[in-house]
Every structure is written in structure tokens, then in C-alpha cells.
Amino acid sequence: MSEYQSIGVIGAGAWGTALAQTAAKAGRDVTLWSFENDVAEAVNTKHENTIYLPDVALSTAIVATTSISDLDACDAILAVAPAQHLRRVLEGFLPYARPGLPIVLCAKGIEQSSLSMMTQVLKETIPAALPAVLSGPSFAIDTAQGLPTAVTLACADETVGNALIEALGTSRFRPYLATDLIGAEIGGAVKNVLAIGCGISEGKGLGKSAHAALISRGFAEMTRLALALGAQRETLAGLCGLGDLVLTCSSPQSRNMSCGLALGRGVSLDDIMSGRRAVTEGVASAPAVVELARRHGVEMPICEAVNEILAGRASVDDAIETLLARPFTLETA
């Protein structure tokens, strides 16, 4: 039996449900907390998340609840609430979190109000928890259906990290251990903003060459910010950096890229967001990424252009022209 036999999942969106399914397939007992009654009821009665992950038959080992106190006896927690709501959700879980409880942060974003990474939010809300980060190239539907997926699980305590990998890993879901939490977090947050940019390029019909340039130059921006914050370069070259960036920037299955596609085709951001129930993390993270970069003296022109478009301060065409008018420079700059 695993050291972490009972897994609590906080957040029953598509990704939280997919991770619950993966943990159940790994033989764990899973309690899935949902903010929404209709989601919890569907998971328990139909064994399907009809709202966020329809047409996927869920394991009967997953028990959904709307009472976060039901996670008090879990051996480890996967925190999959959206980045901008994580603080409030963790504050609600604080009374039930015992010291040393591993909490794996699965949201990819930066808190807009404080510019805090998710590990910092956890440190401020549940300081006695043991933090880990799960990030990498993984669409919820692929993971839930058991298609081969590899991710990074970052944990400073390698013993705990390896135990979490044993608890969650299967032949189809393969976590790789890292100890660089900052790198894993920055990769996940910045790639969402860059994916919006790639979607805009695709929506405007700028071609595959421009798409490749955005991915590679975007990766340089991601790496510069991560290094400025103390991350290791090797982390960004792995699954949680380059791997996640390539996936998210290459498929309209990504909510961030599909948002950019619509923007590039002339749809307003308000119209895009009003038609979505699921969160598009890059929209909320863009201003935080840009401000964090400014405070650390890091140039991120692609992310800045995306943020200007999202904020309504620049049209898509003007933002593109501004990028193309930048001075020529060394590729490593």
C-alpha cells in the first residue's frame, strides 16, 4: 500500500477531475472537493463530471463532496483550484490541514493581486504544509482517458517527492521528480500567456514560421524571468517549461490558445470570456507576469504585447507591428 493511500483533490474542474481519475487508476482512494453542488452530484451518481469533463467514465473510487472538511483525513492533497481563487480555498482548508501534510499545487498561474506564486500563497495560508508542484504538458481529457502523459513533480524533499510519484504514477501517467519549485511554477504560468500570443498569431493567419518564432522567443522570455527569480535553467528545458509551452501553443484544445485564436479573428475578450465556464488562466496571469518581469528588470516583449491586447490598450494589429518594429539584437539577448 502507498504511503499516500488517500488523496484529496481540491477543485473539480477538468484538470482536478482528470487528476482524481489518475490517482484512482493508481489504486488510491480519492476524495474530490467541488465548489459546485451539481458537479459533485454528477460525479457521485453518474460517475461523470458532466460540466467540465463530459463523456469520461470516472472511477467509482472517486467520492465527490462539497464539504472541504471531508478531506481532513487524506494523506496528501492535490490543490487544483484556479490560481486567482487558491488563497481563499486554502484558507477554508486550513483548519483541517495537519502539520507536514503534502499539498501538491497544480494550478498554473500567478496571483494577480500580490504577484505571488502558488507556493508563496500556500506558505502564507498553510505554513506548516509541505509544498510540491505538479506541472507539465498535459491536457485534462488525455490524462483522464489514460493516454500517455509525462509531467514534472517538483518537491524540495526528494523522499516525499518520490513517495508522491509512487502514489500518483501509472504506466500512462509518468511524473518525473525535480527539486526546483520556482522553475516549475514559472514555466506553467508564463506558457499560458505565450499560448494566447500564439493563438492570436494563428487567428491572424501569420503562418507557421511566425508561430515557431513566438514559441522559441517566448521560451527565452520564460527562461529569463525564471532565472531572475532563482530557478535552474535545466528545469525550463524540461516538461514543465519547454514541454508545456510546446503543447499549449500548438493546439486549440488549450483554453489559452483558443482564446488567442478568437482574439486574432476579431472577437472581443468580453465575448470570449462570457461564453466560458472554465477558467482561462493566462488572461488573469498576464498582468502579473508583466509586472513581475518589470520589477526584476526582465524584458518580455511578447508577454507585454499580449497583456496590452488583453487590457484593451492596444489592438491586435498595433501590438503585432510594435513587436515587429523592435530593434535587431543578439538571439541570446
Swiss-Prot record:
Reaction catalyzed: sn-glycerol 3-phosphate + NAD(+) = dihydroxyacetone phosphate + NADH + H(+); sn-glycerol 3-phosphate + NADP(+) = dihydroxyacetone phosphate + NADPH + H(+)
Family per record: Belongs to the NAD-dependent glycerol-3-phosphate dehydrogenase family.
Catalytic residue positions: K191 (proton acceptor)
Species in which this protein is naturally found: Maricaulis maris (strain MCS10)
A Pfam family the protein falls into: NAD_Gly3P_dh_C
GO molecular function, one term: glycerol-3-phosphate dehydrogenase [NAD(P)+] activity
GO cellular component: cytosol
One of the GO biological process terms: carbohydrate metabolic process
Gene assigned in the entry: gpsA
EC number: 1.1.1.94
Top EC category: oxidoreductase
Name listed for the protein in its UniProt record: Glycerol-3-phosphate dehydrogenase [NAD(P)+]
Main location: cytoplasm
Residues annotated to bind NADPH: W15, K108, A140, R255, V279, E281
Gene3D superfamilies attached to this UniProt entry: N-(1-d-carboxylethyl)-l-norvaline Dehydrogenase, domain 2 (1.10.1040.10), NAD(P)-binding Rossmann-like Domain (3.40.50.720)
SUPFAM superfamilies referenced in this protein's UniProt entry, alphabetically: 6-phosphogluconate dehydrogenase C-terminal domain-like, NAD(P)-binding Rossmann-fold domains
Involved pathway(s): Membrane lipid metabolism; glycerophospholipid metabolism
Binding-site positions, sn-glycerol 3-phosphate: K108, G136, S138, K191, D244, S254, R255, N256
Keywords: Cytoplasm, Lipid biosynthesis, Lipid metabolism, NAD, NADP, Nucleotide-binding, Oxidoreductase, Phospholipid biosynthesis, Phospholipid metabolism
Record localization: Cytoplasm
Biological role: Catalyzes the reduction of the glycolytic intermediate dihydroxyacetone phosphate (DHAP) to sn-glycerol 3-phosphate (G3P), the key precursor for phospholipid synthesis.
